[in-house]
A protein has these predicted regions:
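Membrane-interfacial segments
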Residues: 33, 54-59, 88-92, 132-136, ...
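Intramembrane alpha-helical segments
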Residues: 1-58
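Transmembrane helix-loop-helix
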Residues: 1-26, 116-160
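Interhelical loop and helix-boundary elements at the membrane-water interface
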Residues: 21-43, 90-115, 151-180
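Functional transmembrane core segments of multi-pass inner-membrane proteins
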Residues: 39-90, 109
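Membrane-helix interfacial "entry" motifs
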Residues: 7, 28-32, 58-67, 132, ...
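Hydrophobic alpha-helical transmembrane segments
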Residues: 12-16, 37-41, 67-72, 111-115, ...
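Hydrophobic alpha-helical transmembrane segments in multi-pass integral membrane proteins
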Residues: 49-59, 175-187
Length: 187
């Protein structure tokens, strides 16, 4: 409710939409491969753009390229967590009829997708560099070091509960990415 007082009635729409899709995800959407798209939307675009909307003065309300790039990049980095989770659960999901992206493309391509999604999230930072925020591109590149190490471990483990360690490392990497982008944008 305080967000509505501060951000206006648009925040009611955002809140209701988030609630609706969180419910739909637990029912049908996760069974038809929509998880990755929903992560990009509701862990990337919605929180980053709405935070910008709430924090910027009314006369600066237009969304900038930096905001859109940051939101997509955040969604992509967070999607790596969903990829690992679905990779770990691929056999159970297949048996349950849950057609995640990982089930659709198989384990081999999914492992590469994990690596590529993290790489492209960092590559999106080039937009920051072209707009003069050089450090917002350079610092998040440190994330790639940890991301590649985690990927190499993931490939060796392949499947099972040992992948829980990879989930933890991926969550840590996401934290590093967010911290490094934030510091880079402040410099």
């Amino acid at each position: 409710l305080p967000l509505v007082l501060y951000g206006g009635y648009a925040m009611i729409f955002v809140g209701v939409t988030c609630l609706l899709f969180s419910i739909l995800y637990t029912t049908r959407l996760s069974y038809i491969g929509m998880g990755d798209i929903l992560v990009l939307l509701f862990f990337g675009l919605v929180p980053v753009t709405m935070t910008y909307y709430l924090e910027m003065p009314m006369y600066m309300q237009g969304f900038t390229n930096e905001v859109i790039v940051a939101s997509v990049a955040c969604g992509m980095v967070i999607d790596t967590l969903l990829i690992v989770n679905n990779y770990r659960d691929i056999d159970n999901d297949r048996r349950a009829g849950k057609i995640t992206l990982v089930v659709s493309i198989g384990p081999s391509v999914s492992r590469r997708l994990y690596l590529i999604v993290g790489f492209f999230a960092c590559l999106m930072g080039l937009v920051f560099a072209f707009m003069g925020s050089y450090w917002a591109f350079v610092l998040p590149a440190i994330y790639l070091f940890f991301h590649v190490i985690t990927y190499r471990k993931m490939v060796k483990i392949d499947k099972g509960s040992e992948l829980n360690k990879i989930l933890g490392e991926t969550a840590r990497n996401i934290f590093f990415y967010g911290l490094l982008v934030s510091i880079g944008l402040l410099l």
